[in-house]
Swiss-Prot record:
Component of the Mediator complex, a coactivator involved in the regulated transcription of nearly all RNA polymerase II-dependent genes. Mediator functions as a bridge to convey information from gene-specific regulatory proteins to the basal RNA polymerase II transcription machinery. Mediator is recruited to promoters by direct interactions with regulatory proteins and serves as a scaffold for the assembly of a functional preinitiation complex with RNA polymerase II and the general transcription factors. Its main location: nucleus. Residues 58-69 have a biased composition (Pro residues). The lineage of its organism: Eukaryota, Fungi, Dikarya, Ascomycota, Pezizomycotina. The gene is SRB7. This is Mediator of RNA polymerase II transcription subunit 21.
């Protein structure tokens, strides 16, 4: 069961990482839109660019920012959104399959308790078999040691 829980956690982590990358892509690549009745607001890169060009001497050197990726066409952006949504749906379905395979889903508490008792009895039987095998191993080991010792004495 812990194996399935680990798989679910890994898949959820992958889903969240995928969503984070996709949101970053959308933030960088989304075409600006102006709501009806409002004026366009400059983006932060545009504001920084204007300030730097207006006052080239007054701005102290700033640490280099990562380069802004080249803008893509609106058609490519829409295609990327469709691909992102497909990826998210597929990953979400994988997580749902893992969750559905967890034991105890759609099983009553009484059935789970009964199953645990069955497994406990089975485990006790297997433990008895293991203990018998260990005793048998000890007897055989003693016989082998005795034979080896008798061969050593007869020389």
């Amino acid at each position: 069961m812990s194996d399935k829980l680990t798989q679910i956690q890994d898949e959820l982590d992958a889903l969240l990482n995928m969503m984070q990358r996709q949101i970053a892509h959308i933030v960088l690549q989304a075409p600006p839109s102006v709501p009806p009745g409002q004026h366009r607001v400059d983006t932060m890169p545009e504001i920084k660019g204007k300030a730097a060009s207006e006052n080239p001497q007054s701005n102290p050197p700033q640490p280099a920012e990562p380069p802004v990726p080249e803008k893509i066409s609106p058609e490519q952006f829409n295609q990327d959104l469709k691909e992102f949504s497909r990826d998210i749906v597929v990953k979400q379905q994988q997580v749902e399959l893992l969750i559905a395979s967890l034991p105890g889903l759609n099983v009553s508490e009484e059935q789970q308790v009964a199953r645990m008792k069955e497994l406990e009895k089975e485990l006790e039987g297997l433990e008895d078999e293991r203990a018998q095998a260990v005793r048998e191993k000890e007897v055989l080991l003693k016989k082998v040691e005795d034979k080896i010792m008798s061969v050593g004495r007869s020389r």
